UniProtKB/Swiss-Prot annotation:
Domain of life: Bacteria
Other facts: Pyocins contain N-terminal receptor-binding domain, translocation domain and C-terminal DNase domain.
Residues annotated as binding Zn(2+): 656, 681, 685
InterPro entries: Colicin/pyocin_DNase_dom_sf, His-Me_finger_sf, HNH_nuc, Pyocin_killer, Pyosin/cloacin_T_dom, Pyosin/cloacin_T_dom_sf
Gene3D superfamilies listed in its UniProt record: Colicin/pyocin, DNase domain
Keyword match Hydrolase: yes
EC number from the UniProt entry: 3.1.-.-
Family, per entry: Belongs to the colicin/pyosin nuclease family.
Top EC group: hydrolase
Function: Causes breakdown of chromosomal DNA as well as complete inhibition of lipid synthesis in sensitive cells.
Gene: pys2
Protein's recorded name: Pyocin-S2
């Protein structure tokens, strides 16, 4: 082969990410060189040309190597970025975990480069792979040419190939060094971020613990700020203060729950562990703050309920209180209202009673019998009545008090002893009343022990230092009705009270009720055949140091007054008493109302008994009761309720007046009546109904 027939190989720079191929390759132009030409003895004729070709190819190879080394760091890190992108890692690591993921990419690439380097270095050992080969290659090549006297082509291609491998190994080593440094930098950065995260987490935890220890203080401070932002109340009542405080706390809870919802969203979308921990701590603090506010709200609600119950009980007490002055005069008073006005003045009423007593005494002296002498008429003012009220005197609950001695109370009777024994004192005269049309006539009636009982119960009044009043409590005869309270306002405190006290109790004067009027009438005796229905009456004794004489009180509750049933009730179907535990209760069935309407009853107890007897005898309604309840109902008792609807000792169905009797509701108006369980009855009254 002629020298001019030689074709030099080509240089190839291969960019393979961690592959096993050489980064710089020399590709020979031919794979066979044939039979080398004859070389005569003497110096080799190929040395000069061979060295020229070597230097030419070596220059190209060195330049390629130099170019790669110059941009090697950028290209290597670019490989890292491409691998990160393929792995779905963020372009810029912001957390220690992100950095460690990036470090894993770098370490994997470094391992791949090391394997490629090892593939080069593990080839059969020969002269060309010596560590100093690039420096010695030219001299070695020249020596080979001089010694072999062969054609230079084969030697040249082998030298260029091995130089390419040596340079590739150098590139791999440089890349490994770059990657190793990068890996260490990433490790240091990750550790730094972890340390910073630990420090930040410790700060967050310390802040959380401090805030948790001051939850109550923070909650109160926020409530104070919210309260200060509202218009200030001037001399607020406890009820106003409670209402304001309840509004503030309720709004604060609503605000905290909104924050709670937003914070829960932060937990789900937290960008890193620290932010998630912050949100988690905030969630715990919000739970504590809401619990603190709820505890406040519970206390406020409990106090509000307590005050409402006190007010309700006070209202019930007031509605059932007969208030009178203890001045020895004759007075009439309406329950929960005040003194009933007298048409011609209080003195005229006292005179009318005196006249009636005198007339009755004269009549009895000449012809002993049961006689009654009217002394006043009671009329109800229709202008003060609402449409739903029974506009008759029967709806007025009133009491009349007078000196008991005028009705024949012996002065020698020890009332205190009689009262302690729950005893009675016989009186020759008592008071009674009778509804006649739209008026009620009050009369003095003689007693005979048969038609009109002589015995009058005795009670002792006790001084209430809190109210400054003398009081007597008269228990109700029905479980659902409250007791009656009789009070007297003394002209001055009793003897054992210090009138010069710096804080004396000054009772309020008894108000005047304008809804009814007592008009004195001329004393006219009438004979009473049969048995007279008497209202409740008592003889009230007072402590010796009170200076108050014994008082006879005749008081009337519409429940104790005879009356005719009115109203139509309502049609019912299915489980009638199923509604007794709900809403306003179960209405009076229309078929029962039809049976009772128009009938006159001695008192409320009589009506109730006849009502339940009628229900027990109804062929349809009676099917809803068990034999035990039916047996009780046939005797006039109410049916039993299930245990969950009972209240203390109240275990039977009760009848409730939708419009209170004290407010003019009809006692026997069946449109005003509903059947309720004891539990529901209490709930209705607590609601102010």
């Amino acid at each position: 082969m002629a020298v001019n027939d030689y074709e030099p190989g080509s240089m190839v720079i291969t960019h393979v990410q961690g592959g096993g191929r050489d980064i710089i390759q020399y590709i020979p132009a031919r794979s066979s060189y044939g039979t080398p030409p004859f070389v005569p003895p003497g110096p080799s004729p190929y040395v000069g040309t061979g060295m020229q070709e070597y230097r030419k190819l070596r220059s190209t190879l060195d330049k390629s190597h130099s170019e790669l080394k110059k941009n090697l760091k950028n290209e290597t890190l670019k490989e890292v970025d491409e691998l990160k992108s393929e792995a779905g890692l963020p372009g810029k690591a912001v957390s220690a975990n992100d950095i460690r993921d990036e470090k894993s990419i770098v370490d994997a690439l470094m391992d791949a480069k090391a394997k490629s380097l090892k593939a080069i270095e593990d080839r059969p050992a020969n002269l060309y792979t010596a560590s100093d080969f690039p420096q010695k290659s030219e001299s070695m090549y020249q020596s080979q040419l001089l010694a072999s006297r062969k054609f230079y082509g084969e030697f040249l291609d082998r030298h260029m190939s091995e130089l390419a491998k040596a340079y590739s190994a150098d590139i791999y080593k440089a890349q490994i060094a770059i990657l190793k440094q990068t890996s260490q930098e990433l490790e240091n950065k990750a550790r730094s971020l972890e340390a910073e995260a630990q420090r930040a987490a410790a700060e967050v935890e310390a802040d959380y613990k401090a805030r948790k220890a001051n939850v109550e203080k923070k909650v109160q401070s926020e409530l104070d700020q919210a309260g200060n932002a509202l218009p200030q109340l001037t001399n607020p009542t406890p009820e106003q203060w409670l209402e304001r405080a309840t509004q503030l706390v309720t709004q604060a809870i609503a605000n905290k729950k909104k924050l709670q919802t937003a914070n829960n969203a932060l937990i789900a979308k937290a960008p890193n562990a620290l932010e998630k921990q912050k949100a988690t701590y905030n969630a715990d603090l919000l739970v504590d703050e809401i619990a603190s506010l709820q505890a406040r709200l519970d206390k406020l609600n409990a106090e509000t309920a307590r005050r409402k119950e006190i007010a309700r009980q006070a209202a019930i007490r007031a509605a059932n209180t007969y208030a009178m002055p203890a001045n020895g005069s004759v007075v009439a008073t309406a329950a929960g209202r005040g003194l009933i006005q007298v048409a011609q003045g209080a003195a005229s009423l006292a005179q009318a009673i005196s006249d009636a007593i005198a007339v009755l005494g004269r009549v009895l002296a000449s012809a002993p019998s049961v006689m009654a002498v009217g002394f006043a008429s009671l009329t109800y003012s229709s202008r003060t009545a609402e449409q739903w009220q029974d506009q008759t005197p029967d709806s007025v609950r009133y009491a009349l008090g007078m000196d008991a001695a005028k009705l024949g109370l012996p002065p020698s009777v020890n009332l205190n002893a009689v009262a302690k024994a729950s005893g009675t004192v016989d009186l020759p005269m008592r008071l009674t009343n009778e509804a006649r049309g739209n008026t009620t006539t009050l009369s003095v009636v003689s007693t005979d022990g048969v038609s009109v009982p002589k015995a009058v119960p005795v009670r002792m009044a006790a001084y209430n230092a809190t109210t400054g009043l003398y009081e007597v409590t008269v228990p109700s005869t029905t479980a659902e009705a409250p007791p009656l309270i009789l009070t007297w306002t003394p002209a001055s405190p009793p003897g054992n009270q210090n009138p010069s006290s710096t804080t004396p109790v000054v009772p309020k004067p008894v108000p005047v009720y304008e809804g009814a009027t007592l008009t004195p009438v001329k004393a006219t005796p009438e004979t009473y055949p049969g048995v007279i229905t008497l209202p409740e009456d008592l003889i009230i004794g007072f402590p010796a140091d009170s200076g108050i004489k014994p008082i006879y009180v005749m008081f009337r509750d519409p429940r104790d007054v005879p009356g005719a049933a009115t109203g139509k009730g309502q049609p019912v179907s299915g489980n009638w008493l199923g509604a007794a535990s709900q809403g306003e209760g179960a209405p009076i069935p229309s078929q029962i109302a039809d049976k009772l309407r128009g009938k006159t009853f001695k008192n409320w107890r009589d009506f109730r008994e006849q009502f339940w007897i009628a229900v027990a005898n109804d062929p349809e309604l009676s099917k809803q009761f068990n034999p035990g309840s039916l047996a009780v109902m046939r005797d006039g008792g109410a049916p039993y309720v299930r245990e969950s609807e009972q209240a203390g000792g109240r275990i039977k169905i009760e009848i409730h007046h939708k419009v209170r009797i004290a407010d003019g509701g009809g006692v026997y108006n069946m449109g005003n009546l509903v059947a309720v369980t004891p539990k529901r009855h209490i709930e209705i009254h607590k609601g102010g109904k």
